[in-house]
Amino acid sequence: MAKHVAVLMGGLSAEREVSLCSGAACAEALRGEGFEVTEVDVDRQIGERLAALRPDVAFNALHGRFGEDGIIQGVLEMLAIPYTHSGVLASALAMRKDRARDVLAAAGVPIAKGVTVDRLEAAQRHILPPPYVIKPLGEGSSFGVFIVREDQAYPPQELTRSDWAFGNRVLVESYIGGRELTCAVIGEKAHDVIEIKAVGGGWYDYDAKYRKGGSIHILPAELKRNIYQNVQLLSLKAHKALGCRGVSRTDFRYDDRPEGTGELIVLEVNTQPGMTETSLLPEIAAYAGLSFGELVRWMVDDASCDR
């Protein structure tokens, strides 16, 4: 009898639309692998709905708040439904950028200089010498992110808007020039490294991430062998330091510009990497010889409680 997999998707976060795309792609692939699949658009009644549905496995295709921060993981633990990806603690730590920085720094993972402040304070003065980056503490997909350039006299005033939806605390980090890199961990192995270039020379924002043709992916990244291996080593080190399970994807900046510092810096660890047709994790898996169907099947087989 085929396993019944509930694909959790949509949800209540700013990343809802991305999650719907991830969930639809995963559901289609799981059906192709012979699973019985129910697509579940997550709302505040999700506990009651899952208790009634009683799937064998919950495939977590959620992104952002309530799906990536330990909350849905806690619900699934209470219901004793095995689930994919990381557990409660790792999800909560990775989602909170300030807490993740503390854990990574303690593990010897290189991170950018940064400080956490109130968003209104960040709008009043330059917290760090420009260039720097302002990020909400608990959002993904580049929502609410600003790059403050050296020629900007004032910080972004969007931070003062009454309809600001990304929390009152923000992380201010030094901007690291150079190349954008990412590496996926699947199970206990760090796979190949991608260099990401936004089309038009801009930064890797929401449009570059999710619009088809919005970015160029160079796989494998053209790096010196020691740098390439260090990216893989640090990806696995970050994955383990946070206690991640299943899959994760770690983003880096590598400043190899002629005038640069040579730094290789971890930006963040994603415990719920995108699973859309333009997403990086499926691309890395495919390069390793793992089809999208094989990837989602492996994730279902890896599912458990107490993660």
Curated annotation (Swiss-Prot):
This is D-alanine--D-alanine ligase. Its main location: cytoplasm. Its EC number is 6.3.2.4. PROSITE patterns: ATP_GRASP, DALA_DALA_LIGASE_1, DALA_DALA_LIGASE_2. The gene is ddl. It comes from Beijerinckia indica subsp. indica (strain ATCC 9039 / DSM 1715 / NCIMB 8712). One of its GO terms (molecular function) is metal ion binding. HAMAP family: Dala_Dala_lig (MF_00047). It is found in: Cytoplasm. Mg(2+) 2 binds at E268, N270. It holds the Pfam family Dala_Dala_lig_C. It comes from the Bacteria. It catalyses: 2 D-alanine + ATP = D-alanyl-D-alanine + ADP + phosphate + H(+). Binds 2 magnesium or manganese ions per subunit. ATP binds at residues 128-182. GO terms for biological process: cell wall organization; peptidoglycan biosynthetic process; regulation of cell shape. Its cofactor is Mg(2+); Mn(2+).
